[in-house]
Amino acid sequence: MATNARRRRSAAHGAQPNPSGPVNAGFALGNFKLPLILIAALLLLIFTSRVQQNDVVLWSFVSATAVLAAWLVYLLVLSNRRAEIHDFSIVLRSQHYVQLLIQICLFTYWGYYWRPVYDHALLIIAQLLFAYSFDILLAWSRRRAYTLGFGPFPIILSINLFLWFRDDWFYMQFLMIAVGFMGKEYVRWQREGRSVHIFNPSAFALGLFSAVLILTNTTSLTWGQEIASTLTLAPNIYTFLFLLGLIVMYLFSITLVAGMAAITLFACGALYNATVGVPYFLDSEIPAAVFLGLHLLITDPSTSPRTPLGKTLFGVLYGLGVFGLYTLLDSLGAPTFYDKLLCVPLLNLSVIAIDRAVRSIKSETLLNVWRADWLGGRANLAHMSVWVMVFVVMTALGKTDGKHTGDSLPFWEQACSNDLSNSCQRLVQLKTTYCNDNTAWACNELGIHFRQGLIVDRNDSQAQEYFGQSCELKFKAACANLLDDSLVLKDDPHELDLRLLLRQGGLNLMNASSNELYERACDHDWQFACSSNRNTL
């Protein structure tokens, strides 16, 4: 309570005149020691092997440190000239450090199965040092007292859960962080009599940079696609995210936002599947990265509705936004993983309108089941109970972890032969993914598709490349196709191919026994695997 009082006094006074008057005998560091230590720590990271191994990363660190140091010197000179004291107070908010712990758990679990996460850890630490330094200097530049706490942690970790720039473009990562904090500082409005930031800082930076990457067709500069697709390498990732989400839901009452977003996506996907005959998302009811986003990206209390019904509408709109953007991005030829990022800033803009519309409802009808005093103030527990039941049911139906209809290549081949919506395009997409993983069978299949020109435009040179790749992987049918342009020989996947084809978005099945492998293949509708005549390599 005393801490909050000190924070309010500091915020009110901002940069305060020094009661001792101007300092003539040299400079007084005062509170500038804090950003100086942070900048010095960032400078020291330059000498680590992770930074030294790439020149662009190295010069990105040097440039970021130089900019921060110059900014600090400028403010220090100015404050001494004006005899001002730049203040800060320590305020620890539970939503910040709880989200920090949740995100660390996720990075640790995910990184155990996808090691680039651990390799990226030092760069995340550098981003945190940069973020704290930048945020402090920005506040003091605006002659405002700085509130020191865990606030930058969830911002930086959220950004890194969805988008990293590759080493050769790493300076863009620092720029993205700077944009996020500047948006928090400058893009504000009056809400309930207080000046607050409009956008979730991480979502603002992610949304803006996602739009630029799409417009410039430069997604390859980032790890975005890999991040979105490797979450499922961690076993039972949906259950893991669900359990982490329950902690946040219980402590901060965000169940209506996250739960309704998920339920909306489940419902829309089920309706699409029933109508068209194929899954809406390629191999899941909700992509794992989207499931992560609806738990950690849209649930910021500062940039989401305050009313229960408003939270419900916010979650529904996020679900509908992701659902629509997936198709829109796909039709534009853009990577679909941006779907979860682009709609958040737009939803943040709608927050006041949503709350105003909800508060204008005076009816005592069904809408009021979302009142805060429902069940003696324990409405959130009731909402959580509903969400738990929904997740349990969807898991029992195979809609979260485990085998999904879209994991089966024979399913997509049958759907393509029946000319179901987008099925041929997705079949080629899946085979391309597996061929890139050096699945010999998939490469031969792609060669056949490009030679025949039935579901893709005919391209003989492309076909030869795929046949050559498959032949190098010792797939005999591909070698024959490579030598004779008139052939389109097929064969069943070899055992090594199955270890890649049946991974269901997870780790390769290199340690599975042959019996386990063929049982899984049979379960995935590979008919040859259900018989005793098996083709092994």
Regions found by a protein language model. Give the residues of each.
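Short coil/turn and helix-start
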Residues: 417-422, 436-437, 454-458, 472, ...
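Hydrophobic face of amphipathic alpha-helices that form TPR/SEL1-like repeat modules
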Residues: 430, 445-452, 481-488, 500-504, ...
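Membrane-interface helix-loop-helix junctions at boundaries between adjacent transmembrane segments
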Residues: 138-231
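N-terminal signal-anchor module of multipass membrane proteins
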Residues: 17-140
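Internal/C-terminal transmembrane anchor helices
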Residues: 375-401
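Internal active-site segments that recognize and position negatively charged phosphoryl groups
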Residues: 205-206, 213-266, 270-274
